[in-house]
């Protein structure tokens, strides 16, 4: 990944919104950022945590999730971890609720 230690949350959100059509084409209907980058306490080596909802209930095929991750990584320069909203355990959903920033 490139040196993106100074990328702001606003820049991340803007880049995600720019590529939203390509992400939606992979079946993603909603996308939110959470974790250290959403909270504003990320380290230079922190990844980007993304929560998605998809057209179909359940998970997209793995290759589609990888494609979405690569789209995001190419746009932001950040290593990306994708979580599926439908597959999160309730305790995890509660833990990240305060961090969630809806992108689309």
How would you name each of these model-derived features?
Residues 33:
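Conserved histidines in hydrophobic membrane contexts and catalytic metal-binding motifs
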Residues 51-53:
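Short hydrophobic/aromatic beta-strand micro-patches
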Residues 36:
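P-loop (Walker A) phosphate-binding loop of NTP-binding proteins
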Residues 1-30, 39-40, 44, 55-104:
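Catalytic core of pol beta-like nucleotidyltransferases
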